[in-house]
Amino acid sequence: MRKLTKGFLIFGVVSTILGFIMIIVGAQSNGIQSLLAMSKDPVYDNRTEEVTFGSEVEKLDLTLEEHSLTITESVDDKIHITYHPSVSGRHDLTTGMSDKTLSVTDKQASQHRFLGSGIESLLRIASNYSNRFDEVVLSLPKGRKLQAITVSANRRQTTIINATLENATLNTNGYLLRIEGSRIKNSKFTTPNIINIFKTELTDSQVKTEGRHLHVEDIQIHGKVELVACSLSRKIRS
């Protein structure tokens, strides 16, 4: 009996040592990164990447499924898009140009292998932890108007802050659309959920939620403006 107990003890010690060695080797050889890359949910890095576009862009088409979105004003006359890349690369942004229209999306085909419920749970925790890095920041050109802006953003929160949007169509399925300190003209925004608008100038535009929560504070109205909620519909003319 003592020999059997001693054998199990030796086996346990050896297994523990081998486990630590494998962890060290895996970390040194990017094994952890490779494991994270197998997650079916996006796991984002804390480093930032940026792409920039100039006057060659006259129209913008942005579609996001795996990122939250913040729209603001650029410091120059260029379009700047910043984001945190995903470990797998499957959820990174891809861009394309056609007829002076810039298309940006994070919708990519992804393959996922079954790794076992334990590892899947750990990867899900890692994904949730990295969600604070899921934001895409779109900085629109300062002093230059685009002919058309089309945005579809379907994750978490969409924020428009200190920005000027004209000829814009925005559809979002996130839980919140927040607009603050901005100028919106000839545009249409639609969401099924919460809309909060603060210190914003609205001109000939429609803001619509299919839900019941549409909150506005300190806004200026010019031309025909529609603020529409499930329980409230206001058509306002200056």
Residue ranges and their predicted role:
Residues 228, 232, 236-237:
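Cationic, amphipathic, low-complexity alpha-helical segments enriched
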